[in-house]
Amino acid sequence: MIRILKYGEVANDEIFARTESAINVEGVVSDIIADVRKNGDAALYKYCEKFDGAKLSSLAVTPEEIEEAVAAVEPKFLEILRAAAKNIRTFHERQVRNSFIINNENGIVIGQKVIPVDRAGLYVPGGTAAYPSTVLMDSIPAKIAGCREVVMVTPPGKDGKVNPVILAAAQIAGIDRIFKVGGAQAVAALAYGTESIPRVDKIVGPGNAYVAEAKKQVFGQVSIDMIAGPSEILIVADGKTNPRHAAADLLSQAEHDKMASAVLVTDSEELAVAVQKELEVQIPLLERAEIARTSIDNNGKIIVAPTLSLAIDIANELAPEHLELCVDNPFDYLDSIRHAGSIFMGRNCPEALGDYFAGPNHTLPTSGTAKFSSPLSVDDFVKKTQYTYYTVEALARVAEDVAFFATKEGLTAHAKSATVRLEDDK
């Protein structure tokens, strides 16, 4: 049963405690990466058979396989995927940054170029569930950014095939190439390249502890989006909130995995007790009841705060991945929210809207990193470079100042480089 904690009656350490993974996979992942770097495709085939139970003759998904998969998906779901993709595109198109140039008409031009990364790599998990939503959320921003190529990796089933809904989403998103490989070995292949899989410049997408560790280890060789921790939801709710709705929203994250975190912060002790009871009613009805039960019992909590203002302060300190504001006039509180991955406003905005359909991205910072990190966006798939142009007359006006500055830092060659051109012109 979920715990109820009264703020001020328990230690702050208990209020702000986070789910932490005890699994250490650093050594195993390091060995896998080294194997893929050395043996390329041969290592990937080996790991596909070992971990996925699939004996493959080719890593690449063919156009025929994609068409066959799309034909196998029910038409209603294809319509929903296309509608979701449209919403995601509409939102992310507003994120596009433009290059700029500043010409002060005194012989000086400075500017900034916004340039997409050449090739982006998308990791899509397999395992206990298929996530076509991840395909859309992680690839559409890359396509909008203008990446020359978007490559996807995802583990196959034992039959050597990729889940049809994953391939259907990939076709809708316009992904260029797809490969049947998952786990740390897939991350290694994207980072270093193999005979079949091209090296990418950016790797994005969630995964298990092995995938997260692999992304951590290859960072620097390649850019990554973030190191994702367990899924999180925090609901700030007043006494008018329907406890059935609050419990359902908590369970929407608790069913993800046993390490997921579900937290309710409320100024109503009556709501706290009602939600606690409602969770016990709803959990046995879930298909993933065992996972949700473990998550709620081990990592869930209901915090009773004296005021909604303090509830907001608690939310800011926890900086959750998903934050629901189940209160009257939620926009009155928006300016007070400083740290959250994504905010869901009002009583009619379950977090599931953001997971699938609304348009804002669902790849979000976890484990408190929303204090300094942002959701996945078009920005993740571009880089910026800057440029400077001076005429000889413009240089002459500032060369002595530049030289003086450089000399103060003890870099006389810097100083000379600023003045030598003027000496040549005498």
Residue ranges and their predicted role:
Residues 1-118:
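N-terminal Rossmann-like NAD(P)+-binding subdomain of aldehyde/semialdehyde dehydrogenases
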Residues 3-8, 177-182, 302-307:
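Short acidic-hydrophobic, aromatic-tinged amphipathic segments that line or gate anion-handling sites
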Residues 97-102, 260-265, 285-296, 326-327, ...:
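Flexible, glycine/charged-enriched surface loops at secondary-structure junctions
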Residues 102-168:
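Conserved small-residue-rich beta-alpha loop and adjacent elements
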Residues 174-244, 248-252, 256-261:
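Conserved NAD(P)+-binding/catalytic subdomain of aldehyde/semialdehyde dehydrogenases
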Residues 226-298, 302:
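A conserved active-site cap/scaffold subdomain adjacent to cofactor or substrate pockets
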Residues 316-426:
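C-terminal core of ALDH-fold dehydrogenases
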